[in-house]
């Protein structure tokens, strides 16, 4: 199942479909009144759809801190039975972590409808002025922690947000670094977990030759990569004795074995048959816990295998890097899946329709997964924390995090008006399906007219390498974009991010080479705007639409900033 917000701009595409929709519950006197109300709700951003296998539900819902308040429901396709309908609508409420699923009516309900709601677990809240029937939802949440080595700091950032929202789990499943983080989360000591990741370096994980490492991050990356390669070839993997020592110093075996909930399960791979082994940690003897955690995290051949009772075990990622199936088998009806993009096998499974899967995965690269760098750990902690905050509705944005995105929408509407009225350019491209498809491919997410302002602003920030590890006001992000245009910032950026992986180093080099050419293009666009060369600008929009559009948007935003208007020497 898939749930999406529906926007007013989609009416042209969806109108004929909605005209076939039938009202399921008596919110309005007629089906047509129900349809009309749905489109009016798009103005308040309260219109939604849930896409199932045989039908789609279109509904009006108001999200409050505790409940999903439903005020209208229409169905297109096969009419679901009542049991299926209530399961699906409650699935939507659970998807947004709501305590209650509620229905609101304007007029009193007949005995038939009251009986139907009561039969499916709903009760009327008589203390409210409105007619509201609600059901308290039950959760059996499984936290699924994937493998990914040094990327694991991201998972602790996610957990920090979950603790702030008092979201608890019944089951934790972890592979590799997910197993290590799983046992930290099981002990419920956030400060310990944060402190560990903020101070964790490669020499605390792997036993490598003691050599002086360069202060230059690029040179250090090459040094540590070579050391690991030698260890893999000569010794069959680097020893993880430092990690074993660190883990044992953090484990509270007595506390772990007393914990009844959540239950922790780790995944490792047995040699030589490469069999997946799922281990219930709280059913082990106290002296076995560290062994099975380390077995799951032994990324052979970069790291040596783990020997337990005469058997060899290596990283669980060789068989099941994202153990969603283990969580479902152990009773999870909701799975919060924290994927940190580690190497390994993602097992193909069919998630039951009644199970709510929440995927938390960074749009951004998390760096190298074998080199542990304190600054990069801190950066990834922030990314995980902010991504989960967005998932829970605390902030907005996709690539970046915003307190509010309303101003971005306003800037975009004014910019389109500026193109037409001031520059006298045609903007018919926004009416073309190809424009939207290309934009979605570039942005890597759904984009409609109402969200285009945020998408274009985020693409501009990405283009200028603005960092995503903080919450922005829209004007603050614009100021960051403009500053990146006018100053050398690579050293400062890398100091804040920490160690990069090989692909990131290549992208930085590529950007440095392209920077002069991109600045030349911006200057050329600025010259055409100043000289009112509208035909040439229109031609560039036809031949290089997105590059030209982003450059025009950058120039427009620059002129709109109050500090720029007051201090023209900054241009």
Name what the model sees in each region.
Residues 1-37:
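Short amphipathic alpha-helix that is part of the acyltransferase structural core
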Residues 83-87:
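Acidic-aromatic/histidine active-site loop/patch
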Residues 25-45, 55-67, 72-77, 82, ...:
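Patatin-like phospholipase
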Residues 176-187:
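Short glycine-enriched nucleophile-adjacent loop
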């Amino acid at each position: 199942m898939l749930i999406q917000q529906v926007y007013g701009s989609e009416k042209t595409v969806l109108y004929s479909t909605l005209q076939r929709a039938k009202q399921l519950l008596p919110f309005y006197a007629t089906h047509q009144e129900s349809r009309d109300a749905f489109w009016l709700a798009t103005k308040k951003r309260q219109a939604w759809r849930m896409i199932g296998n045989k039908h789609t539900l279109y509904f009006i819902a108001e999200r409050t801190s505790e409940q999903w308040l439903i005020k209208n429901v229409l169905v297109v396709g096969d009419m679901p039975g009542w049991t299926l309908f209530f399961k699906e609508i409650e699935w939507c409420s659970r998807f947004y972590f709501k305590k209650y699923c509620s229905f609101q009516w304007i007029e009193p309900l007949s005995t038939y409808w009251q009986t139907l709601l009561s039969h499916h677990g709903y009760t009327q809240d008589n203390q409210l002025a409105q007619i509201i029937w609600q059901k308290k939802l039950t959760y059996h949440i499984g936290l699924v922690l994937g493998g990914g080595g040094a990327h694991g700091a991201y998972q602790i950032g996610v957990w920090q947000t979950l603790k702030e929202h008092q979201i608890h789990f019944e089951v934790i499943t972890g592979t590799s670094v997910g197993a290590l983080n799983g046992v930290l989360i099981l002990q419920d000591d956030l400060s310990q977990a944060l402190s560990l990741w903020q101070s964790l370096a490669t020499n605390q994980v792997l036993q490598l030759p003691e050599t002086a490492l360069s202060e230059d991050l690029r040179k250090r990356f090459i040094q540590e990569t070579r050391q690991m390669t030698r260890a893999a070839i000569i010794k069959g993997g680097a020893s993880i004795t430092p990690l074993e020592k660190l883990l044992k110093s953090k484990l509270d075996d007595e506390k772990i074995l007393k914990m009844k909930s959540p239950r922790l399960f780790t995944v490792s791979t047995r040699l030589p048959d490469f069999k997946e082994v799922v281990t219930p940690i709280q059913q082990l003897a106290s002296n076995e816990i560290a062994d099975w955690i380390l077995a799951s995290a032994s990324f052979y051949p970069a790291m040596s295998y783990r020997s337990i009772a005469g058997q060899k075990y290596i990283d669980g990622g060789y068989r099941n890097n994202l153990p969603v199936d283990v969580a479902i088998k152990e009773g999870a009806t909701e799975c919060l899946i924290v994927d940190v993009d580690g190497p390994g096998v993602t097992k193909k499974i069919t998630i039951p329709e009644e199970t709510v899967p929440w995927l938390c995965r960074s749009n951004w690269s998390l760096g190298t997964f074998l080199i542990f760098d304190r600054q990069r750990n801190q950066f990834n902690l922030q990314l995980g924390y902010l991504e989960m905050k967005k998932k829970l509705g605390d902030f907005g944005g996709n690539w970046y995090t915003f307190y509010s995105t309303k101003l971005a929408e306003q800037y975009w509407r004014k910019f389109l008006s500026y193109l037409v009225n001031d520059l006298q350019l045609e903007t018919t491209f926004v009416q073309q399906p190809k424009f939207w498809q290309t934009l979605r491919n570039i942005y890597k997410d759904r984009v409609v007219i109402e969200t285009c302002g945020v998408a274009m602003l985020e693409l501009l920030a990405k283009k200028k390498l603005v960092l995503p590890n903080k919450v922005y006001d829209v004007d603050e992000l614009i100021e960051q974009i403009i500053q990146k245009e006018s100053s050398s910032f690579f050293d400062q950026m890398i100091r804040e991010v920490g160690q990069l992986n090989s692909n990131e180093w290549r992208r930085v080099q590529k950007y440095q080479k392209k920077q002069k050419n991109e600045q030349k293009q911006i200057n050329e666009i600025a010259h055409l705007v100043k000289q009112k060369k509208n035909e040439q600008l229109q031609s560039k929009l036809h031949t290089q639409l997105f590059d030209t559009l982003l450059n025009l948007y950058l120039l427009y935003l620059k002129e709109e900033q109050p500090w720029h208007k007051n201090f023209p020497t900054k241009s």
